[in-house]
Amino acid sequence: LTNYILSEDEKYPFFFPVNGPSKASVTSMRNANYPHHSSLFFGCDKVNGGNYWQEGLERGQIISLRADILESGGERAVIENECIWRRPGADAPIKDKRTITVTAPSKDKFILDFDVTMEMLLDVTIQKTNHSLFSGRMDPDLAVTNGGTMINAEGEIGEKGTFGKRSAWMDYNGKRMGGTEGMAIIQHPSNEWFPAPWFTRDYGFFSPTPMYWPENEKTTDLKKGDVLKLRYRVIVHAGNEKEERMIAAASHVF
């Protein structure tokens, strides 16, 4: 279904492939224009002057300290992962702990729950940035530019209809190999900034991105010792309209 990639040679941990019912990944892994789009990932730019999003390990890196498989077998697996946010010549601003739960209730669907607790090790200032938090980059076959559909909980579609809009979830799907498949990202109602506005692109990128629309229009400021808990659900699925009803229902129960 998916691999969770942990390597000191990578910018941050990420998921790839993220296989749909066709057995091909619904996400893409970097390209010439956007080499920092690593499939399905979590990061942030402009954190106390560091960049924990774009290429260049010297600019900032999210490094795995520990990863444990808590549960494995049948249709369910659970991983716990601790990470530190580091860059040369600066104190680490953040450490985080992730709990990743993957379930496969049917051959046409799997669910990935990504729960992250971020602890501020310093006073943290995040400058306004469109590079923030949980994000997905779809395979070009499924992008709006190639006939795919991006739709939010309110039924608004495409980059024009969804960019900057607050919505509980977003689904991205398209036709491939004779069928329709896609991936939805759902924000948990307990999340700070819920529902965060979305940064969306018809070429395949989508992310609930609160740091691009900060309340003071300049920065997101967190104090040393602050704890930020965020939860996201990813549903990789066949179909579209029927699945969107299922996604809407799932947004209330995880």
Language-model features, listed with the residues they occupy:
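Active-site/ligand-binding surface loops and adjacent short beta/alpha elements
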Residues: 123-195
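Beta-strand-rich recognition/accessory modules
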Residues: 185-254
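A short, structured loop/turn motif at beta-sheet edges
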Residues: 68-77, 104-108, 175-180, 190-194, ...
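Beta-strand elements of well-folded, non-transmembrane domains
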Residues: 22, 83-87, 100-104, 118-122, ...
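Beta-strand-rich N-terminal accessory domains
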Residues: 1-35, 241, 247
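Acidic (Asp/Glu-rich), glycine- and aromatic
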Residues: 4-19, 105-150
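Extended, loop-rich substrate-binding clefts of extracytoplasmic carbohydrate-active enzymes
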Residues: 38-108
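Hydrophobic residues positioned within well-ordered beta-strands of beta-sheet architectures
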Residues: 79-81, 96-98, 112-114, 134, ...
